[in-house]
A protein has these predicted regions:
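Phosphate/nucleotide-binding beta-alpha loop and adjacent structural elements of enzyme active sites
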Residues: 1-218
């Protein structure tokens, strides 16, 4: 479940024809809520997990979302993907990642498989678009994704953080471990972003050249 405020999205982007990227969209559960408050936006949702492919094809038509069974990363081509498995009697799969889980990760994973991967930069060039807002949940791979942002500068970026100790090579941690990795902050700040909100698990970055209202996070 995403904790991005629907009121924040509605106040800043309602009735605007923005381009919204939902990267790591899972089964489009949160995407449908974003669509409900931004009816004039164009949505692009990305999820490489095979288990969600069929349901996402159906839901994307129902919700009016452009769905792509891709991973977004710093690689154009194929990349190894580590799928989670259902935990006990849980109805929904846990988070998956392009990074191999470490011993600190309590989630059970199946056999990794290859998935298609694209960068934000190459996808935008191919489709002649540029995102105005990005919601991203990619289990420690956020830094890799934004390394290939290219010339694109979304007005806002909402990142669902994950402790990088849970995945090999993962970055962007807010879970109070001994050593905190702030490389994602540094990268986005170098692109002109400011940290508007940060919690143990989430961060909101706003580009300094835009004026978005963030009263929900004050």
């Amino acid at each position: 479940m995403s904790y991005v405020s629907l009121d924040f999205l509605k106040e800043n982007f309602s009735n605007e024809k923005i381009v919204f990227f939902d990267i790591g969209c899972c089964n489009l559960w949160d995407t449908k809520d974003f669509v409900s408050v931004l009816p004039d936006a164009t949505f692009y949702a990305f999820e490489p997990l095979k288990d969600y492919y069929e349901i996402n094809l159906e839901r994307s038509v129902e919700y009016g979302v452009n769905f792509f069974n891709y991973a977004i990363s710093d690689v154009n081509g194929e990349i190894l993907f580590y799928p989670s498995e259902k935990q006990g009697e849980q109805e929904q799969l846990q988070s998956s990642s392009i990074f191999k889980p470490t011993i600190h990760n309590v989630v059970s994973y199946g056999e990794p498989y290859m998935v298609k991967s694209v960068t934000i930069e190459s996808f935008c060039e191919e489709h002649n678009i540029s995102p105005d807002f990005i919601h991203i949940d990619v289990e420690g791979a956020e830094y890799n994704v934004f390394m290939k942002l290219g010339k694109h500068r979304p007005k806002g970026i909402w990142v669902e953080m994950i402790g990088y100790r849970y995945y090999q090579n993962g970055r962007s941690d807010r879970n109070g471990i001994d050593e905190v990795d702030y490389e994602l902050d540094r990268l986005l700040i170098s692109y002109g972003y400011e940290v508007a909100f940060q919690s143990d698990n989430d961060s909101l970055y706003i580009h300094k050249d835009v004026n978005l209202k963030t009263i929900q996070y004050e």
